[in-house]
């Protein structure tokens, strides 16, 4: 399973760790992903999604039904 948010599409990005002596080593910045069950009232069931914290805020703002319809239309689930 990939580390990608199903709502926003955010995935890992790369960058550098930089020490006090300005030595640079490569690293990955991972998104804050959570497995979360959302209750969908229209379907009378839970839907389990792998979403970032930002994705959860989007669902809170727009509603799970709207977001779920967009995800299904895009073929992500």
Swiss-Prot record:
GO annotation, biological process: translation
Keyword Transmembrane helix among record annotations: no
Domain of life where this protein originates: Bacteria
Gene Ontology MF term list: structural constituent of ribosome
Pfam families, A to Z: Ribosomal_L28
Disordered: annotated span: 1-20
Gene3D superfamilies noted in UniProt: Ribosomal protein L28/L24 (2.30.170.40)
GO CC annotation: cytosolic large ribosomal subunit
Entry keyword annotation includes Ribosomal protein: yes
UniProt keyword list: Ribonucleoprotein, Ribosomal protein
Family membership: Belongs to the bacterial ribosomal protein bL28 family.
PANTHER family listed in its UniProt record: 39S RIBOSOMAL PROTEIN L28, MITOCHONDRIAL (PTHR13528), LARGE RIBOSOMAL SUBUNIT PROTEIN BL28M (PTHR13528:SF2)
NCBIfam families, per database record: L28
Protein known as: Large ribosomal subunit protein bL28
Name of the coding gene: rpmB
